[in-house]
């Protein structure tokens, strides 16, 4: 192989590496994000009965900047439990004005039957679940 051909292949290889690194670092989040001040989280949205019932069940892990946003049809008192949830979670209830009305920290996976219910006295339209220790 001639030196010129080797040089062209090397340059193309370097360009491919630079593009790949740039693309990986510059990927924008496709899904919705929820922010508390400067702390932002990519969230999966649970806005149907099936999605809200399933939630984060049977997940073995959750990225440190990820969570699940539960959206209800109307403001109300929505209890949660940790049935079949494998990771500890923080839960944040928000009203229709997106104001935090209650925080439950470090909800543990359910090992009892029946599982205990996590609730509060207020009214919420949204609940966000994040890794325990995040809220």
Residue spans of the language-model regions?
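N-terminal Sec-pathway targeting helices
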Residues: 1-12, 21-23
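Compact, glycine-rich, soluble single-domain proteins
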Residues: 19-135
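Accessory terminal and edge-of-domain segments that mediate assembly/interaction
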Residues: 15-16
